[in-house]
Amino acid sequence: MDLAVLAWFGATNHPWVWAELSRSMPSSETPLSNGGMTTLVALTILLASYALAPFPYWPSFFRLLWFMLTEPMPLGAKVQQLGFLLVESISVPLRTLLWYLDELLFPGYRQIPIEPVFIIGEPRCGSTLLHRTLAKSEEDFFAVRHLEWRFPFLTIQLPIAWLGLRQFLGGISYWPDSDVGKLAARMHPNRLDDWEEDGIFFEESFCHHFFIFLRFPYPKLLKVVDRFASLPEAVQRMMLDRHHKAIQKVAYLKKNQPRYYLSKEVTSHDKIPLLLELYPNARFIVLIRESKDFMSSLMALMEASTSAKNAGYDPRSNADWLPEVQTRMQQDCANLVGLCKDVLPAEQQLGLYSPDLFRDIPATVERIYGWLGLEFKDRLREELIEQSKQQQIRDKGYTNQTTVFPGFEDYDQLVSSFAAAAKP
């Protein structure tokens, strides 16, 4: 053994050495073992809550932050964007706690099977009308409400139900109380109690979805936070696993569990192949109409929604915004055509032409019920006849200017085939 080590060892065995060392070390009376240790433990727990957080998807979160900090945009819009990111980041510890409390307190929810019916197609083709119409038949379907997508925690949803708060909270509009917010609300009514599409979950929880582009309308950002299939496969599966659990939690709250989970996801078709792998018996309702009609309506809604979420900012003031969105929608439509022709089994997809739904809701729903093997009851028919009458006379409260967009020829051929197939 080294002589220096022996000398040190011998020296430290002298009583006076230990006395000096003990005086310099913290005792039970020092702040480190009280306030200091408490702070250390609290910091460790805080860091663990971020490390184990189920949400958000941090790479997308930091890309949003980077674009907000580096790309030009009016100050008011950036303030709203920063507010969203602050809420998203500050709420992580609480959301982590609630997520794992669900796992601890309600493990039975994971045993509930999910048999989905996915409404896909393109936005502004009547998918909200169809989704909410079918969701009202709670004996046959269950859907997820906006409030449930935003707070996918049984430890939140159960107290809301017990205290009777859902009606109060559900009456809150998603849209701001501004002129452009009211316009967006007329185009797409959205209260927290409304049945809403799955994209709300991916936007609010993971910061990775087409919808997040409406909050952060930087043209170069769209490809980054929109494409699901470009994510690592492990990340894709993680997102869909948590999406599956969020659906199971809603099913857990149902006393009489309906047969089908009713999904609406009309803006993220590149996740469909993996969904088909995870749910091999899933059914797909493909609802579409001509590109000139859905694109004209979509552009108007996107402008209103983006402006409402960004302090009145007009996205068309950026010359790159419209071409980027148009290219994205062309690619999405091409993807949809490929899915219908080459990916989705013929017996698992039902093509619907939107004008048929608008003209005759009962006939369209009866066709869906027959395809799914569900009983179409007389009471439901009568309710739908009345709904269809109201649909014909309702005042939308807005008008869209029709514009023809090039690059949708293959998609429009698919629309024509759906329209022809529906004719007697």
Located regions from the model:
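PAPS-dependent sulfotransferases, especially Golgi type II membrane carbohydrate sulfotransferases
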Residues: 1, 5-95, 225-240, 251, ...
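N-terminal signal-anchor transmembrane helix
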Residues: 93, 97-119, 149-152
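Glycine-rich phosphate-binding P-loop
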Residues: 119-138
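Short His-Asn-centered micro-motif
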Residues: 120-122, 262-266, 288, 354
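Post-Walker A helix-loop "phosphate-sensing" segment adjacent to the P-loop in P-loop NTPases
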Residues: 137-147
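PAPS-dependent sulfation machinery
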Residues: 149-261
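Flexible, glycine/threonine-enriched loop-and-boundary segments that flank and lead into catalytic domains
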Residues: 252, 257-281
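Conserved phosphate-donor/acceptor-positioning beta-strand/loop module used by diverse small-molecule
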Residues: 265, 275-300
